[in-house]
C-alpha cells in the first residue's frame, strides 16, 4: 500500500547493510525515489537493481566519505540526478569497546562515522530542505547512546548525535523540516548464533529480537508527510528494552 510520500526523493546513507536495505525497500514501496549511498558498491548495485526491477526510481552512490568536502560531492551527485533531496536517512553501525582498549584510530573512526559524517550530511542537505519548505530527517541510532558499559566511543558519538538532532529540529521547525531519531534495540542478523539470539531475546520484554523491517517501518512513518507534527523526538524500536533504563529520552 502506497503512502503519501509519492514523488519524494530520499537519500539513504549507509544503505549497504540489512537495516539500510530494509529502509530502501520500505520507502520504495511508498513511491519514494531513492539515492543509495554506502561503501559496498557491489551490494548497493545489487539492491538498486532489485528495486529498479520492482519499478522504483533509484541511483547508487558508492562512498565511504566522512569528510565534509567528499560528502558535499556525494550530495551534489544526488541533486544532479533528482534536483533536490526531500528525505535524509542516516543509518550507521559501529563497533564498541571498553575505554582502555580503544585505539586512537578507533576513537577517531567512531567520532568520524558516528557524529562528524551525519553532521556534514545535515549541513549539505538541510539548507535546501528549509529553502523548499519541506524536509524529513531520520537519524538511526541505538541504545548505546545511553552510555552502556564497554561502548565508550560509540556512546560519545551517539549522544552527540542525539543532541544534534534535537537542536536541529528546533532550528528547522518553522521551515517545514522535521528531524527525529529512531533508536534500535537488538536486531536479528543472519550471523547471530542461535544461542546468542535466544539469550538476547530473553532480555527483551517482547521476548524476540527486532528485525530490519521493524526499524524500516518506523523510518517510513517519520519520513512521510503525515508525520509533520513530530519533530525533535526519539522513537524507540526496541521491544520495550528502553523501559529498563532510567534515562531514555
Swiss-Prot record:
Pfam families given in the database record: adh_short_C2
Disulfide partners: none
SUPFAM superfamilies in the record: NAD(P)-binding Rossmann-fold domains
Induction trigger: Induced by toluene.
Pathway: Xenobiotic degradation; toluene degradation
GO biological process, alphabetically ordered: toluene catabolic process
Subunit structure: Heterotetramer composed of 2 inactive BbsC subunits and 2 active BbsD subunits.
Name of protein: (2S)-[(R)-hydroxy(phenyl)methyl]succinyl-CoA dehydrogenase subunit BbsC
Amino acid at each position: 500500500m502506497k503512502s503519501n510520500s509519492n514523488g519524494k526523493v530520499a537519500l539513504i546513507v549507509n544503505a549497504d547493510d540489512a537495516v539500510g536495505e530494509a529502509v530502501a525497500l520500505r520507502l520504495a514501496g511508498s513511491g519514494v525515489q531513492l539515492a543509495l549511498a554506502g561503501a559496498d558498491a557491489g551490494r548497493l548495485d545489487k539492491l538498486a537493481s532489485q528495486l529498479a526491477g520492482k519499478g522504483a526510481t533509484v541511483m547508487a552512490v558508492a562512498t565511504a566519505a566522512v569528510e565534509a568536502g567528499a560528502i558535499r560531492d556525494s550530495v551534489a551527485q544526488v541533486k544532479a540526478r533528482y534536483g533536490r533531496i526531500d528525505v535524509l536517512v542516516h543509518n550507521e553501525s559501529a563497533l564498541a569497546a571498553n575505554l582502555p582498549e580503544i585505539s586512537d584510530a578507533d576513537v577517531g573512526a567512531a567520532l568520524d562515522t558516528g557524529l562528524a559524517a551525519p553532521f556534514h550530511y545535515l549541513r549539505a542537505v538541510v539548507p535546501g530542505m528549509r529553502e523548499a519548505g519541506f524536509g524529513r530527517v531520520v537519524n538511526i541510532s541505538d541504545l548505546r547512546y545511553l552510555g552502556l558499559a564497554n561502548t565508550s566511543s560509540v556512546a560519545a558519538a551517539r549522544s552527540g548525535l542525539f543532541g544534534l538532532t534535537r537542536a536541529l529540529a528546533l532550528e528547522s521547525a518553522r521551515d517545514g523540516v522535521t528531524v527525529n531519531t529512531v533508536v534500535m534495540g537488538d536486531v536479528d542478523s543472519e550471523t547471530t548464533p542461535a544461542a546468542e539470539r535466544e539469550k538476547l531475546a530473553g532480555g527483551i520484554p517482547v521476548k524476540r529480537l527486532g528485525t530490519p523491517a521493524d526499524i524500516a517501518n518506523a523510518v517510513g512513518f517519520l519520513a512521510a508527510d503525515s508525520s509533520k507534527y513530530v519533530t525533535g523526538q526519539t522513537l524507540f524500536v526496541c521491544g520495550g528494552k528502553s523501559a529498563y533504563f532510567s534515562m531514555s529520552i
